[in-house]
């Protein structure tokens, strides 16, 4: 009998439907506590409801005065538009370096609103991670070009020394080297946990562009950019979608989890997991409701969560 159930499930599971769910989810820029994440969560909810399930959305506060255990929550963030242009010697915009509308991760997530022209500086030493890198260098009101860990550079440059923002061209170390992915952008975000007020903006460029700017700065060129970010922070929510298939033994359950968040498109991390779980739950509900599959002994509970939070 178990073999028959297995065959039934194999026939009923649709890889094409799972792929369609991946396509739908990846249309949303779904970082934690954002309108894009909420839109993806609504899509999951609608699909579960259409399959006869009764999903519930649990909303946990995205606010700086809230803590989950020892971890502070954070404000929700929405970005309407953001661009970064290179300026010529006359102060006119020439090359478009970054555009949130085209590539959302070309903006450092959770940037504050800004509009203005800024000189770009690059630091020696550890690239802005340590206080010694700033000796004899005035970064106040300037944009710091760096590929080093964002949190440490932002603290040193923006918080302690009044830099306006960060221009980031780093790539995650590991088996890759810079030349393997010269045109890749690394997903990067400020985190303003707890009572710390957001105080900076930033953009992300690829290694190729970053190296060109570094070479020009090293040669004495005056590199200036025009930055525009339209964003807002507000008390929002971290949403968790839950669906449940009851079992015949009320005290026992199987818990299935997928994280729904991450920047657009992030198909493998983790739209694929969220879509697979969605397809499994709707398939099982259909088979059980039609009588083709008996109700399981243990309940099956699925949750779609924002990773590391909520």
Per-region residue spans from a language model:
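Short conserved beta-strand and strand-loop elements enriched in small hydrophobics
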Residues: 82-85, 146, 223-228
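Noncatalytic luminal/extracellular "stalk/propeptide" segments of secretory-pathway proteins
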Residues: 2-4, 23-137
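Short alpha-helical segments and helix-capping/turn motifs at coil-helix boundaries
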Residues: 41, 67-71, 129-132, 148-159, ...
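Generic start-of-chain signal for non-secretory N-termini
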Residues: 1-20
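Extracellular/luminal Protease-associated
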Residues: 23, 35, 98-201, 265, ...
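Metal-dependent peptidase/peptidase-like ectodomains
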Residues: 6, 13, 97, 202-203, ...
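Catalytic-core environment of secreted peptidases
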Residues: 15-37, 47-55, 73-74, 143-148, ...
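Soluble metallo-hydrolase cores and metallopeptidase-like ectodomains found primarily
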Residues: 102-131, 189-270, 279-282, 286-291, ...
């Amino acid at each position: 009998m178990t073999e028959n159930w297995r065959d039934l499930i194999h026939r009923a599971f649709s890889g094409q439907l799972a792929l369609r769910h991946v396509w739908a989810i990846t249309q949303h820029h779904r970082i934690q506590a954002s309108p894009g994440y909420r839109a993806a969560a609504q899509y999951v909810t609608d699909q579960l409801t259409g399959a006869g399930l009764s999903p519930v959305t649990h909303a946990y506060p995205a606010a700086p005065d809230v803590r989950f255990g020892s971890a502070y929550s954070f404000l929700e963030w929405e970005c309407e538009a953001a661009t970064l242009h290179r300026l010529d010697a006359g102060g006119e915009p020439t090359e478009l370096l970054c555009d949130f509308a085209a590539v959302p991760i070309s903006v450092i997530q959770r940037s504050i609103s800004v509009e203005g022209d800024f000189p770009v500086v690059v630091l020696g030493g550890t690239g802005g991670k340590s206080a010694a890198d700033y000796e004899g260098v005035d970064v106040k009101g300037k944009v710091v070009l760096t590929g080093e860990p964002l949190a440490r550079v932002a603290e040193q440059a923006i918080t302690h020394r009044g830099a306006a923002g960060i221009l980031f061209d780093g790539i995650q170390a590991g088996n890759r080297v810079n030349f393997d992915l010269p045109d890749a952008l690394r997903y990067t975000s400020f985190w303003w946990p707890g009572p710390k007020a957001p105080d900076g903006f930033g953009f992300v460029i690829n290694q190729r562009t970053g190296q060109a700017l570094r070479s020009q700065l090293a040669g004495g060129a005056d590199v200036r950019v025009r930055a525009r970010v339209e964003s807002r922070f507000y008390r929002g929510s971290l949403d968790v979608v839950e669906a449940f298939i009851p079992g015949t033994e009320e005290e026992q359950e199987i818990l299935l989890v997928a994280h729904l968040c991450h920047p657009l498109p992030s198909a493998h991390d983790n739209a694929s997991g969220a879509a697979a779980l969605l397809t499994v739950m709707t398939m099982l509900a259909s088979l059980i409701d039609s009588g083709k599959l008996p109700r399981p002994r243990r309940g099956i509970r699925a949750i779609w969560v924002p990773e590391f939070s909520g």
